[in-house]
């Protein structure tokens, strides 16, 4: 699967219910959406980093920078047969697991579309209901 480009978008999201943790309460979130484009298809994933470095040292802003400055140059214009190949190319990027995972998940989505199977099948699922 050849990766032609990566697009990053920030989306505001109001939560249906206030989310309370030991780090505080959230009603609104910033979402980083990662889109991989390849072979006429699009793969999507959400980066799960938060706005502040509380739960993790990664944030929406650091993930954006890492994907744009370090991940994209390692994957755009290259072909990967499997997610493992993609992760091998990204192995030198250390300490930014949420950023790398978002790109990996977008690749899984892209690959499932290329295989014309649901993502749960591409990930090895066997049953429709759990």
Positions of PLM-derived features:
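N-terminal capping/lid subdomain adjacent to the active-site entrance of alpha/beta enzymes
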Residues: 1-130
């Amino acid at each position: 699967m050849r990766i032609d480009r990566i697009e990053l978008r920030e989306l505001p999201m109001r939560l249906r219910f206030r989310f309370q943790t030991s780090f505080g309460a959230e009603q609104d979130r910033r979402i980083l959406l990662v889109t991989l484009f390849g072979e006429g298809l699009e793969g999507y994933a959400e980066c799960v980093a938060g706005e502040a470095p509380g739960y993790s040292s990664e944030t929406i802003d650091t993930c954006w920078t890492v994907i744009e400055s370090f991940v994209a140059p390692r994957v755009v214009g290259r072909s990967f047969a499997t997610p493992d190949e993609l992760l091998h190319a990204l192995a030198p990027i250390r300490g930014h697991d949420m950023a790398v995972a978002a790109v990996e998940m977008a690749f899984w989505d892209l690959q499932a579309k290329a295989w014309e199977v649901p993502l749960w099948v591409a990930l090895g699922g066997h049953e429709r209901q759990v």
